Amino acid sequence: MHTHFLSRRETLAGLAAVAIATAPPARATTPSPAATLLDSLAWRLLAFDPGEATRLGLDIGAHAALRGRLEDRSPAGIEARRRFLSDALVELARVPRDGLDPAMLTSLAVTESAFRTASEGMALPYGVATIGSWRNTPYAVIQNVGAWLDVPQLLDGDQPVKNAADAEAYCARLSAMAVQLDGETARIAAARRQGLVPPAFLLDKTIKGMTDSVI
């Protein structure tokens, strides 16, 4: 039996490049509160973005259920993610720093900075604010952002289909895409009520991309 902890330096994510480190029980040491917290935050964040868990190969074992889920792109889903960040920042502020090595201190600082920046972005009543990713945009859906692009890429490029359980997970995600589109539509409508509409040239690119993806 192995003890699994997410790589501390890679916890920043989206925690976009998170990885699992394993150590034999004979050499296992009790992780510091900081390491335990970063590991917990990484898994909680991956629960908000199950597709990332699949891309990283982490939707296995106790986390296998993530393989059949998609992130919540509705206004309620965005608010839940914002609350997670707010709570996480409190937890990060409380974790003891005394005696930590420079690598761990750096991991905490980078994670805290990324979470704070994302939290500030999510406080805005429109757009997409990511955690540790470049895909920030004032629009809920645009030519390079949205379920219309992300779900097909996930299912075609990263979703394993090796057995019946995998096939069921694939179908579950395919069905859940409709819910994602509804959530994004609600955010687009809310942004429009605020007068936030993409310029025509971006709409043209987005519509062309959507059209090409279904032809």
Where are these regions (language model features)?
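N-terminal maturation segment of proteins
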Residues: 27-215
